[in-house]
Design a protein with these regions (language model features):
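Residue-level detector of conserved catalytic or cofactor/ligand-binding positions
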Residues: 231-240
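Active/ligand-binding-proximal structured segments within catalytic/core domains
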Residues: 54-62, 165-169
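Conserved polymerase palm-domain catalytic core
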Residues: 19-27, 31-32, 69-73, 78-81, ...
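Acidic, glycine-rich two-metal-ion catalytic cores of nucleic acid-processing enzymes
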Residues: 18, 24, 28, 41, ...
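Charged boundary/loop elements
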Residues: 1, 60-73
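Surface-exposed loop/turn segments and immediately adjacent short secondary-structure elements
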Residues: 1-20
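Duplex nucleic acid-engaging cores and interfaces of nucleic-acid transaction enzymes
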Residues: 45, 49-50, 54-59, 83, ...
Length: 241
């Protein structure tokens, strides 16, 4: 950090450009921190300062492209959103929408089990078609972890772009849940009446998602709807890993 502090802006830009011409990230430092309310440790992967600069550059390019395509009720690691907004949405669904049943989902070991190939395809699917950039992201995902070797899956917590990548992975799940009811649009919808009819007389599941990182809730009006969502999620979430 002290070395970078002595660099001029031009020197930093030239260095980062030189790194990107044939990018090879340095090994990530493994740090274990305590999990709140648990005896277990949370593994973090801390990149070197120059790799953090590269990740910040990538974040500033990707975030404006991805943000409009993320679901409106995903609140974790996003600009101008917080846990307070997620809580407000939950309160609104309970008090105004009468959604009293909750499917509470926390994906165990999510960050450590992200499928690299699927993630890169999802980035492509969001309209990011710069193969050179995708290649650099692939190299970041494969950064060696000191004392552990090269990972075959997962995105290390501690990286600057890891939160954005996690939202990209879970964006498909957000929209799948939402399309079951909240954003469902029947093909022949000609009026609001038809839209309401289609909701009532189909096998759609009545539920609304509220997600913060890998922890999300689906609010439902009945126990039966919550049970249907729960069983469907067990099946649909497997390809995410």
């Amino acid at each position: 950090i002290e070395d970078i502090g002595r660099c001029s802006d031009k020197e930093m830009i030239d260095t980062v450009r030189g790194m990107l011409s044939d990018y090879k990230p340095k090994a990530v430092r493994r740090v274990l921190i305590p999990k709140p309310g648990s005896d277990k440790k949370r593994p973090l992967g801390i990149p070197c300062i120059w790799d953090r600069l590269v990740q910040q550059c990538i974040l500033q390019v990707l975030e404006p492209i991805c943000e409009p395509k993320f679901h409106n009720h995903s609140y974790g690691f996003r600009p101008n959103r917080s846990a307070h907004h997620a809580l407000s949405r939950m309160v609104s669904l309970i008090n105004l929408g009468r959604h009293y049943y909750c499917v509470d989902v926390d994906i165990k070991g999510f960050f450590d089990n992200v499928n690299h190939g699927k993630l890169l395809k999802q980035i492509w699917g969001l309209g990011i078609r710069d193969k050179r950039l995708i290649s650099i992201i692939g190299k970041l995902l494969k950064s060696e972890i000191q004392g552990e070797g090269i990972p075959t899956k997962g995105t290390p917590q501690g990286g600057i772009i890891s939160p954005l990548l996690s939202n990209i992975v879970l964006n498909e799940l957000d929209w799948w849940v939402s399309d079951q009811w909240e954003t469902y649009k029947p093909r022949r919808a000609k009026s609001e009446t038809f839209h309401n009819y289609a909701h009532q007389y189909t096998n759609l599941k009545d539920g609304y998602i509220v997600r913060y990182a890998d922890d999300f809730k689906i609010m439902c009006r009945t126990y039966a709807e919550a049970q249907r969502f729960y069983l469907s999620l067990i099946h649909i979430s497997e390809p995410t890993r």
